[in-house]
Amino acid sequence: MTHELDLTLRPDWQEVEQLNQQAMTFLTDTGMAHAEVDTYTMVICELAENSIKYGDSSQPICLNVKVRDKSVCVQVKNKVRSEAHGHLRELDQTLQWIRGVQDPYQAYLERIRELSREPIANARSCLGLIRIMYEGHSDVDFVLDDDTLNVSALSRSR
Amino acid sequence: MSEHNDVDHNATDTAAPVTAAAPANHAEGAIKRGGQTTAVDLQCASRYSLWLAYRDEPPHPATGAFDSLTFETDAHTIALGPCQVLEDADAPDGHYRLVPMASIHDFEKLFQQSRADVLDLAARNLPLILQYRNNIDPAFRTFVGDVAYDISVYKELFDRLDAEYAGEPEPVREVIQQGLIRNTGQEFIDCLNAHVADMERIIDNFEGEQHSQHGYYLRKQLWGELLTAPFMARTNLKPRGYIGDSEMMQMCYRNTYEGDSTFGKLLHHHPVSSAAAQAVRNRRPLVAAMAGDYADRMGASADNRMRLLSVACGPALELHDLLNSRERCQQVEYSLLDQDDLALGEAAAALGAVEKRLQTPVKVNYIQESVRTLLATRALRERWGEFHFIYSMGLFDYLTPPVAKAVLSKLHALLLPGGEMAIGNFHVTNPTRRYMDYWLDWPLYYRTEEDFLALTEDFGDATAWIEYDDTGVQMLLRIRKATT
């Protein structure tokens, strides 16, 4: 059985608190264990925050969550401005590198080390996404389709 | 000779960097010894030391060990633990050199970039990393101990034998090494195979992240030995920042004994002779045959070229199989896409070899772009045109379902009516799966037939089916677009 949540959010930080509540209620209603509810609520909110941070502030964010017996898939879509494309190239490289490290905790530590060694003007943390991979037990991936950014987090196992 | 177009980088604007205000290059602080605190002025002296001047009466002695130093920069309050104050001939007048003994900050970064970076940061995470072994299954721990023991015995033996005949002329060394590989080497390979089979049995009931934790533990124990094998070193270290790069593919294609020692050569050959590597080799003639068959069916010619797109082309060695005659070379227009300029260079070399051998040019476009951002190119069709045949062999194994679906949809939109696609993905039953995960640190997205076909469920105008290579490991999603 698939449980599905579809939401359209304003790209506004104030939306995150309400989203947190909505996500918890939805996930709890699927019959998920309490710890999993916390985990995937974090995943949903991190992805939404990422969209607010890098997305076009005049365009809405579409969020979709599918909970199946063996997987949870969170997808967030929103428009991005062309200025963000440079960041997406970095994100692409970072995610491919993390995917190549099977243990996300090692990637998390390594990324923190790398960030501390970068000049502050270049610092683009991606830490929220790495947190999803490590604490959220999910694989993060993205694709840019025209100017719509589609970021997804797929649970590695339930 | 070639009709090669320049690499299309699909350039987009990059974000302008944020300009940070220039930080001050000095600070005021307080240094403590016993119960005595003394005010100090500080400047960066070197990456890991400071120039220190006492603002008032210096402590006695002015140099030597101190308990702590605290100071403020523009962005941080820094508290150092024990440190040493030294006389230094290079110090400015009235200054000493201060060197921390713990929390060893990078002072150049701190003062010049307002960034706190500590040399011994990694040591702070040690307890967490050491705790990792508490999660390891006892049977697996015993297994890894046995593997490490056996491998070290074989390594020592082969290294000793290598040293014994090292002074022989090269042809003699080569023949002796071939003999070792064929005889004692086979015993070592049998031993490895037995251990891999044991591992499969022990981890059979593991779930999810247990696999990544246990794989990490195994690699940690065998790290030195794994690095002697060029293939294993490459899959584990990922020198290009991603898994499955074109050199790894080339190693699979070569399927030879490579390395600096007999032991390294044997360990290198073990994975490149596995079922998964055989599947990589099998897909090369397979995709060439599919594309060649399409060219024949459409009656491709110099005036009616078959337009081919290879996505994540890697070294594109299948060009040797497809472009096997002057006529075939004149029937096609190739577009080769890869994120990695080194891979495109290797593909260009493969094409150059074909052109040289057949003494005819091949029409080709090179596109350097990641599949995750290539779809950002508005009007892909206008930019690159439409294609009769699109294939991608080693890409979808790394894409999550949502991204795989989006990429496939865009590629499908680039197909001409009646055009075909061949998309590779390893099957979930790959017998080498856990060996790749644990020993090679090479995780893939494995798919079932159902998973793979589900990526096409929104294609109203297409027929989709699944084919396999001889090993059954390499699954191919075949798609044919409707003719109208």
Regions found by a protein language model. Give the residues of each.
Chain B
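A short acidic, Gly/Pro-enriched loop at the edge of an enzyme's catalytic core
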Residues: T377-I390
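Conserved Class I S-adenosyl-L-methionine
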Residues: R434-L455
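Conserved beta-strand signature within the Rossmann-like core of class I S-adenosyl-L-methionine
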Residues: G418-N425
